[in-house]
Amino acid sequence: MGSEQALSEVVESAKERFGRLRHLVQKFLDDDDVPQECLPLLQECAEIWSSYVDACQDITMQAPKEDANRLSKGFLRLNETAFLYYMIVYTLLEDTLPRLKEFSSNKDQNVRNLYGERIQLLHNDPNIERIRNVIENYPKFIQLQTIEPGKLSSMLHFHGDALLLIDVRPRSEFVRAHIKCKNIICIDPASFKDSFTDQQIESVSLITSPHSDITFFSNRDKFKFIILYTDTQLHNNFQQRQTRILAKILSQNSVIKPLSGTKILILENGFSNWVKLGGAYQSSVSETAHLTSSSSTPAFGSPQVPTGLFNQKSLSPNKDKSMPMVSMNTQPLLTTVQRPQLPLYYSDLPIIPQPSPNRNSPTVQKFSPHPPTTLSKLNTPSTIQNKANTVERISPDIRAAQAHAYLPPASNVFSPRIPPLPQQNLSSSRQTILNNSQVLDLDLIVGLENIGNCCYMNCILQCLVGTHDLVRMFLDNTYLNFINFDSSRGSKGLLAKNFAILVNNMHRHGAFTPPNVRTIPVQTIQFKKICGHINPMYSDSMQQDCQEFCQFLLDGLHEDLNQNGSKKHLKQLSDEEERMREKMSIRKASALEWERFLLTDFSAIIDLFQGQYASRLQCQVCEHTSTTYQTFSVLSVPVPRVKTCNILDCFREFTKCERLGVDEQWSCPKCLKKQPSTKQLKITRLPKKLIINLKRFDNQMNKNNVFVQYPYSLDLTPYWARDFNHEAIVNEDIPTRGQVPPFRYRLYGVACHSGSLYGGHYTSYVYKGPKKGWYFFDDSLYRPITFSTEFITPSAYVLFYERIF
């Protein structure tokens, strides 16, 4: 095997490329308000042609830097942009304008002359043919090359200054151990996607990286070789795929620094193989035994191995004789990286006694990324689906699991809880936590910088950071065990990791804060950039709805940690299955739907925040019903337009039976036509952490400012559906998963809104335990409340409750 191997990656063909560009031209013309008079249309052509000329000048300036055999994708995009401008003008002059009625009858010589000049410019343009050739001849395959470990070791020894190594693994793995090289950086594989350019790698992927990494990457064009490597034994498909994507970005998507003089290579077989063969690496002491224990006799790096990898051919044939064999110590050089011990966590909240385990008050189990044991005996997904879709009784073995369904944890419990699951060997950090006696404060008091109309984000962050079970998993790094790199629905850990960074910064500045000490506000700009990268809605400085941001953040964290995120969505129920489901009690049907939901959506976020409600339509003629089940992490309840109301009025409004208007009547599948019908919502699952949005804005964005009275202690048991016929039915064949009344809650956070949706301001109140009490947060400012019920406010918009017993 040679020192370099070509890896072909199929890219867009010339035919596909031209088809895509012509589609964009047509889309522009369809979307644009094209003038219907000759002179204005000619003027628009002149403006677009000016843009075309500018694009051609950019191409001319960039062309000398381009290798004809290795054009960058940035250069291709310049040519594509120019081609788009040309084709828009071409279509307008050759097709659109001659079709205008005014054109054939127009006697204005000035218009005729202008048209002739534009056509002449179009047909005599000297650039378009060259632009077409670049687009047509852009490589159909991108050649990625690999380098053998022996050759890399030799190059590091003799030409180390000419090499930049990029470790494409999570930073935690990089810190534990990486190839020994002074010019090395780490780019997390979850921090970029295939559409990125080198500029986005610098501005997004490296946003939280050390300054040295950013400096090395900004000087990447000064290195003769860039070597990428990952670990082929961990997250195999994802990390290898991301490494190849990064190589393509650097070779083809380099916009600000084309690497025409730099060769990009990928280390063959990754980091584990490098260590196994005796390559030099830097490691924390705690990882040394693990890395070396599985290594066989080094294949290179030892004088006793004359036939080792160092006898292979060099990257450059003419350098073979000038590169003598390198003798390397078989014991890698170690740089000790001390790991801080992870402490226990402290909360001012009083410890609430847990009920003793029994049928109605089950025990709490630890979180595990495996599917629920209540379905573990069903061996295949199809079997699971069939069981969940029918009324057939589930195996009696499942009944025993009912004793393990859990209730919300008391505040002295160490980790987020999830239903009873098979155990998996998790990170040793959990044991470190349990074995350490140090105590940390979870009631963080620190302000957040407002970097421009981001108060909607700050108020939600303050309330979520008041959720101890959520904060705990991001402080002790438990969340890292559950990032799903294979899921196509999340950001592959990008959002979760940056949320963890923010939480740790808030903890660093806001833990153990004395009442009379003012802390430095925490910067949120990096976290907001990541949010804007994932959802462009949050990329600018426009004001947004805080409850929508809360929904976005919880959904994003869930998808990053979703253990079943890579599974296909379940098929919809058949008509027969729906009919059978309608015959069930509401408790049984909703529990089955929840089990189906967990098969594709299973995370600690679901465990903490997710609830469920049923929506039932009923025909008033034949009484046929149809019930659907929806999950929620933020429950939006309507605010009645009255002078005064309390939150239970909102829940009554939410769950009342509504007679549908003529325009909204349900098309009854039994009557086979639209009939007078009703709709009713019932809450079928109440979560541990209940987030309630008071719907103050109507469809026209008019705000209802009525003062909604909400209590510190809230009992929602009457609004938890036992059954539509009010029968208390106990299901013995499916787990309760904590859905055992009563459902009593305690308020711990309030997000407030004053003003209009587009011109208002967001603040928050958060409970910091009995010693510190309630605090008011207004971006970077904070203070204790000035009177005991200040947090009960007319401006309340989103309420945060936690379940108690």
Swiss-Prot record:
Domain USP: 446-804
Recorded catalytic activity of this chain's protein: Thiol-dependent hydrolysis of ester, thioester, amide, peptide and isopeptide bonds formed by the C-terminal Gly of ubiquitin (a 76-residue protein attached to proteins as an intracellular targeting signal)
GO MF, one annotated term: cysteine-type deubiquitinase activity
EC number(s) stated in the UniProt entry for this protein: 3.4.19.12
Superkingdom per UniProt: Eukaryota
Entry-linked SUPFAM superfamilies: Cysteine proteinases, Rhodanese/Cell cycle control phosphatase
GO cellular component, one term: cellular bud neck
Renumbered residue ranges of the record's region Disordered: 359-380
Keywords: Hydrolase, Protease, Thiol protease, Ubl conjugation pathway
Gene3D superfamilies: Cysteine proteinases (3.90.70.10), Rhodanese-like domain (3.40.250.10)
GO biological process terms, semicolon-separated: protein deubiquitination; proteolysis
Active site feature: 455 (nucleophile), 761 (proton acceptor)
Similarity comment: family membership: Belongs to the peptidase C19 family.
Additional comment: Present with 300 molecules/cell in log phase SD medium.
Protein name as it appears in the record: Ubiquitin carboxyl-terminal hydrolase 5
